[in-house]
């Protein structure tokens, strides 16, 4: 199986196929250092954690992940805690996407898996037949080709895979929301042990975290805002204003390691299969980061896709 994209979807699919005895090659346009440092979602739902443990990828997750048994909804300067574990028997775990990627890369390389980083000129051929091909230029500048039994397009919303499905076959649905998120990663301990989702007249705010030393915070802003207009002082002032609560709340400040503005949009393409090309993760659907669903949906996709490819390639069904 040729897999385009070394994000969580592509790497986990490669690992699942390996466990089923099916070889794969993962092609990635970026460097290993880049994909291992991309700050993305950090909330793993219980089925995602269960699967990672099931396939031997839970050791560091269990050591370093932060289980959350509830979350707070903050309205009118008052907290309303939702006791997730008490109500459902399950929890969420805070563990950065880049950490999941590190674990997956380490597992694939330890098993002798083939991941090619810094490839370019990727193109998919003959995906409508039984012998699809991927042509590309490798990291050393040499042209190369993979002959595959199937191709998994796990290269996100801007990759080549989705665009390879003919326009007359695919249907796209999208919606742009009239707001964006300004997100920061701050080198400071979290100000609260759980996530806080805040409703405020000036806009939404979210207190989250990536580790006991790193806090992730978000502000709802206009999609036309320029990050250059948001110096540290303005960001912290707005966070203090929106996260204020009766009874006292101390927002810990620290150096900003990352900042950016993300437009809120939803996108879905169908079908997710065309011939021997299968789309997964952001290549097939994008949801706003408001619910931290992106990586969890990608994991759910490849869990199903791995089973389907195993049936196709080992049982011809």
Task: Identify the role of each PLM range.
Residues 30, 157, 283-284:
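Conserved Walker B
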Residues 4-19, 23, 104, 152, ...:
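Conserved mid-domain beta->alpha element of the FAD-binding
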Residues 36-40, 45-111, 125-128:
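Active-site-adjacent segment of FAD-dependent monooxygenases/related oxidoreductases
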Residues 34, 155-156, 287:
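Glycine-rich, N-terminal phosphate-binding loop of Rossmann-like dinucleotide-binding domains
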Residues 106, 113, 117-123, 127-264:
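Conserved FAD-binding catalytic core of PHBH/FMO-like flavoproteins
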């Amino acid at each position: 199986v040729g897999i385009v994209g070394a994000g969580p979807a592509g790497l986990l699919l490669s690992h699942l196929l390996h466990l089923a005895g099916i070889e794969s090659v993962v092609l990635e346009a970026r460097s290993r250092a880049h994909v291992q440092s991309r700050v993305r979602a950090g909330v793993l739902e219980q089925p995602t954690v269960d699967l990672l443990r099931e396939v031997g990828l839970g050791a560091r997750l269990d050591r370093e992940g932060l289980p959350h048994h509830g979350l707070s909804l903050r309205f009118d300067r008052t907290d309303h805690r939702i006791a997730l574990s008490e109500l459902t028997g399950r929890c969420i775990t805070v563990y950065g996407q880049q950490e999941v990627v590190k674990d997956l890369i380490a597992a694939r390389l330890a098993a002798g898996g083939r991941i090619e980083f810094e490839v370019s000129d990727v193109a998919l051929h003959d995906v409508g037949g039984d012998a699809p091909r991927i042509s590309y230029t490798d990291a050393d500048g040499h042209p190369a080709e993979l002959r595959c039994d199937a191709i998994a397009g796990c290269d996100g919303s801007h990759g080549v895979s989705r665009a390879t499905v003919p326009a007359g076959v695919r249907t796209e649905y999208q919606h742009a929301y009239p707001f964006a998120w300004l997100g920061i990663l701050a080198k400071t301990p979290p100000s609260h042990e759980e996530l806080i989702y805040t409703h405020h007249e000036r806009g939404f705010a979210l207190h989250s975290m990536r580790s006991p030393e790193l806090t992730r915070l978000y502000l709802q802003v206009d999609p036309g805002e320029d990050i250059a207009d948001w110096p540290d002082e303005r960001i912290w002032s707005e966070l203090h204003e929106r996260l204020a609560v009766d009874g006292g709340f101390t927002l810990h400040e620290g150096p900003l390691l990352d900042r950016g503005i993300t437009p809120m949009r939803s996108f879905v393409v169908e079908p997710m299969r065309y011939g021997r090309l299968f789309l997964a993760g952001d290549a097939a659907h994008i949801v706003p980061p408001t619910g931290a669903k992106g990586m969890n949906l990608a994991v759910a996709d490849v869990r199903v896709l791995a089973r389907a490819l195993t049936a196709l390639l080992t049982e011809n069904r």
